Swiss-Prot record:
DNA-binding region, residue range(s): 158-252
SMART domains: FH
GO biological process: anatomical structure morphogenesis; cell differentiation; epidermal cell fate specification; hair follicle development; odontogenesis of dentin-containing tooth; otic placode development; parathyroid gland development; regulation of transcription by RNA polymerase II
Listed name of the protein: Forkhead box protein I3
Gene name linked to the record: FOXI3
């Protein structure tokens, strides 16, 4: 026997029906006979399908409801149409006699012969629960959805603004861009219903922000203005800290502050460098010729050279300044090199240091540009003797107008015979404890 939805759900059960287990046992004992006492259209109406419909799902293609079991699966179309009409809304057929054939597969309820009634029987409402202590005001768990007012919802949600932003919004809303403390309270309470419940806490926070935040300035009240309490306004320099409309603090304030501090440090460094260069320039002009030339050196890291060097470099064709005696010392050392012998050791003069080039000490005043030296030096000073000794010939490769074979054919970075002046690096970047 095939039962459809009867045992599991009890969807189509009727009042006064015996238990499903008992009905199934009775139907198994006497497949063709109805029970002794039953209500019409009970579970006993579910009879065994015909032999041609061994598969319980084949009845869906047959004549269907309202046709007896004797009608096979391949019944006439008229019978199938009548069964469909009876199932979807026609009044049910009369009940079969007690000793007749078994009833149809599925019969609608007797009260109303419609398919919707069967669906209503399927979706029976649950039995009413006992009344809760809250009474009829709390119909269920989702009773909070009954709030229809937007203000009720706004009272529960905290606005996503800081107290500083609320103060700024209040001040910006004023026509004169200034408000008293009481007016700020009133603006916050009127604009956001959340703050209408407890005013003691947030009003205290408003006062703290006004006192501790540098963006809010206190403006005294005029003499002809009645009332009490000072006005509060926004500092014009702090308006960049708030976004348009939201008045939230920007994160760019830290970067702006760092850039401002960097510019301040750069300005202070420039001033100190200017003072250092001016002091060196005055020292060059005021030193007598007998002093050591090392005190007149320009620092290698200084951005501005001394005044004498600036004027000499700007006018390479002009006359040599008389206030720079270090150039004369440099030229005298060159002339000494040209006539010295290989065995003679040069003794360093005052202020000069060893440069590590063929054991020859030169004056530290060689830090001046080579173009200045070549343009101002006399030709007889720059020309070195080729008939000197071997040591002198080796040293002359550094100063000869044409490079030796050891120079590697490098191109001249200077427009002068001193383009292969390999001691320039040691002069620009001193190694041996030179004073800066």
């Amino acid at each position: 026997m095939a039962l459809y939805c009867g045992d599991n759900f009890g969807v189509y059960s009727q009042p006064g029906l015996p238990p499903p287990a008992a009905a199934a046992a009775a139907a198994a004992a006497a497949p063709g006979a109805p029970p002794a006492s039953r209500a019409p259209y009970a579970l006993a109406d579910y009879a065994a399908p015909p032999a041609a419909a061994a598969n319980p799902y084949l009845w869906l293609n047959g004549p269907g409801v309202g046709v007896g079991v004797g009608v096979g699966v391949g019944g006439p179309p008229a019978a199938a149409a009548a069964a469909a009409a009876a199932y979807l809304g026609a009044p049910p057929p009369p009940p079969p006699p007690p000793g007749g054939a078994a009833g149809p597969f599925l019969q609608p309820p007797p009260a109303a012969g419609t398919f919707g009634c069967a669906q209503r029987a399927f979706a029976q409402p649950a039995p009413a629960a006992p009344a809760s202590p809250a009474g009829p005001a709390a119909p269920g768990e989702l009773g909070w959805l009954s709030m229809a007012s937007r203000e009720d919802l706004m009272k529960m949600v905290r606005p996503p603004y800081s107290y500083s932003a609320l103060i700024a919004m209040a001040i910006q809303s004023a026509p004169e861009r200034k408000l008293t403390l009481s007016h700020i309270y009133q603006f916050v309470a009127d604009s956001f219903p959340f703050y209408q419940r407890s005013k003691a806490g947030w009003q205290n926070s408003i006062r703290h922000n006004l006192s501790l935040n540098d963006c809010f300035k206190k403006v005294p009240r005029d003499e002809d203005d009645p009332g009490k309490g000072n006005y509060w306004t926004l500092d014009p320099n702090c308006e960049k800290m708030f976004d348009n409309g939201n008045f939230r603090r920007k994160r760019k304030r830290r970067s702006e502050a760092s850039s401002a501090s960097t510019s301040t440090v750069a300005a202070g460094t420039t001033k100190s460098e200017e003072g250092l260069s001016s002091g060196l320039g005055s020292g060059v002009g005021g030193k007598p010729e007998g002093d050591s030339p090392s005190a007149l050196l320009r620092p290698p890291q200084s951005p501005e050279p001394p005044e004498g060097t600036k004027s000499t470099a700007s006018s390479p064709g002009g006359s040599l300044l008389s206030s720079a005696p270090c150039l004369n010392t440099f030229f005298s050392s060159l002339s000494t090199l040209s006539v010295s012998s290989s065995g003679g050791a040069q003794r360093a003069g005052p202020g000069s240091r060893h440069l590590g080039i063929q054991g020859t000490p030169l004056s530290s005043s060689g830090a001046f540009p080579a173009s200045c030296i070549s343009s101002e030096a006399p030709p007889d000073t720059l020309q070195l003797s080729n008939g000197a000794s071997s040591g002198s010939g080796q040293r002359s490769s550094y100063y000869s107008p044409f490079p030796a074979s050891t120079s590697g054919g490098q191109s001249s970075p200077f427009g002068s015979p001193f383009y292969n002046f390999s001691m320039v690096n040691s002069l620009i970047y001193p190694r041996e404890g030179s004073e800066v």
